[in-house]
Amino acid sequence: MKKYLIIVFFSFVSQFASAEQKDSFLVSYTLVKTHTQKSLKAMWKKNKLPTMFAPIRHDVDIYEITYRGKWVDGSMRLASGIYYVPKEVKKPLPTMVFCHGTEIFKGRKISDNDAQQGISLGAATSGYYSLFPDYFGIGSGEGNHLYQHAESEANAVIYMLYAIDELNKKLNAKTNGQLFLTGYSQGGHASFAAHKYLEKLNDPRFQVTASSPMSGAYDMTGDQTKFMFQKYPRPFYLPYLLVSYQEAYKILNTSNIYAIFKSPYDTLLPNYFEGERKHGLGDLNSILPEIPKDAIKDDYISEYTNNPDFTFTKRLKENNLFDWKPKAPVQLCYCQGDREVSYLNSVKTYEEMTKNGKTDIKLNNLSPRLDHNTCALFAVMATVNFFDRYKYHGKNPKLKDVPPFKKMLLGILKKRIEKQYVSSKSDKAYF
């Protein structure tokens, strides 16, 4: 009898251990650096960032993490990201996920000079546990990144949340259950995809408190498509989409997606999309024609234009994010002067969601003049203000406006940047 009980006991322990292993998504975590409040103040001063808009309240530990997440074929793949952990925390804090903009270069490093990483760092020191997912195929993850692909974007966020839930137990980091999602440009699409999939998943651990997608292409088959047929500052978007959707969906009956491109692009593009992807977006942009469609063979352009059942068009529709009804509050940030991601993406999303009965949704036009790059700063500020209302006031926030003095300073700063933008028309891409 005693021997039988021992066997049963070890059988139970073995089954429990197997279940634990099966449900484990965290692969590795490494503390890379710690920022003290003193070092953050020096960084803020160097970058002329007022603490009024980005308060410094905590030292921050920065972790490089790897985790396992579900790929489009159902298999589990390695992904990576950065986790910013506030220190000397006296009470449970909310979690914020920031999804970064378009990137093709795989070798992401933790850097104090990266503007997007700075958003996550700023959130952490102000009082959020802050996640910066790389997406699949960027950083130290496996495979290739799928551009503007809602499911893989969402899974990169969701499985990182699972991994961080495990890591928080190891770090004794206590969250208050609030979850905020945001991102800029592609990150706007990715964060909104994560919102949609999280609500569908309905995991009680990860209920979305609010989301604030910024300047994203939520309507993949609408106004955004006009840029394919005119001079466009970022022609790399089109081949990036085609290569990504071929890997995800096999949109063409060919093993060589590059056969869709005219010469010399059919031989140049593999150098940028295959292998280790060591080139940046600027390098890719420099080899492409000003009008994106001019890189594609005419018969494929004709198929896209005239055949509503073209597989590429169908797959684009599947990745639209405007026609659903979120449960959690939403703010859509954009600038009307954006010539890269049409502001009508946000307008249409707002209109369709209100038709679907969504009431707690805000359409926030931050400037009629600022473009895709210069809009980002003000979109982030508006997002922080939006999230802080829920952070401090829970499910029923006091939806007060920005304090008058702070609003005045924001107005002065915006006018100054608008004036500089009109005079310089910088083409540098930040997001």
Language-model features: locations:
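Short alpha-helix in the alpha/beta-hydrolase fold that links the catalytic acid
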Residues: 194, 328-329, 342-353
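Alpha/beta-hydrolase active-site loop
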Residues: 147-169
